[in-house]
């Protein structure tokens, strides 16, 4: 198959893998452009980085790759006006704006977390045993709370769980809702 246009996006670490060079070699005859794109630089309120490739048999696509030309959006910019909800509560007008329940221990943990912070903010009695290991495998990015005035971390499929990353709401003592996660990924607020 020799399509006129080829697009690809992937993790930036692909650049360090031999398969990327093989992929480029298979695009002989194409005009190729590729770059690592910072999501926040193109209006997506996440710190996510992606390798983006455009290849064209029609010559230079003229599309160019995005550059830092837009106002950077923050968590506050995109979810700051949503109705406040508590852990285990849902917005009666929006079934996707629902926060999972937290255990009593995790509620205490998030109450001790600062915006932009992690489990390292907690008193020692709230720290999990795995965080106290001297092996270095302490998962510093789990149990984090987002910061209002920064981009969110990369939103993953596990973002609804407080212990799965830096997915604590910046101010409310809960994990982010599916609605908030969707908006942070640039889905419209009315998306069903």
What are these regions (language model features)?
Residues 98-192:
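C-terminal target-recognition/interaction regions appended to catalytic cores
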């Amino acid at each position: 198959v020799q399509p006129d246009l080829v697009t690809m996006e992937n993790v930036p670490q692909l650049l360090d893998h031999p398969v990327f060079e093989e992929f480029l070699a298979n695009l002989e005859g194409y005009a190729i452009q590729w770059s690592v794109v910072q999501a926040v630089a193109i209006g997506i309120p996440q710190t996510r980085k992606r390798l983006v490739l455009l290849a064209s048999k029609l010559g230079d696509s003229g599309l160019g790759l995005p550059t830092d030309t837009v106002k950077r959006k923050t968590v506050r910019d995109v979810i700051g006006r949503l109705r406040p909800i508590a852990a285990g509560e849902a917005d009666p007008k929006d079934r996707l704006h629902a926060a999972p329940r937290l255990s009593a221990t995790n509620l205490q943990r998030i109450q001790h977390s600062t915006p932009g912070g992690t489990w390292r903010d907690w008193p020692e009695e709230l720290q999990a045993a795995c965080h106290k290991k001297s092996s270095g495998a302490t998962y510093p990015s789990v149990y984090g709370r987002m910061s209002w005035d920064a981009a969110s971390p990369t939103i993953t499929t596990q973002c609804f769980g407080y212990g799965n990353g830096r997915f604590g709401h910046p101010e409310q003592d809960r994990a982010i809702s599916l609605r908030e996660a969707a908006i942070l990924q640039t889905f419209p607020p009315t998306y069903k």
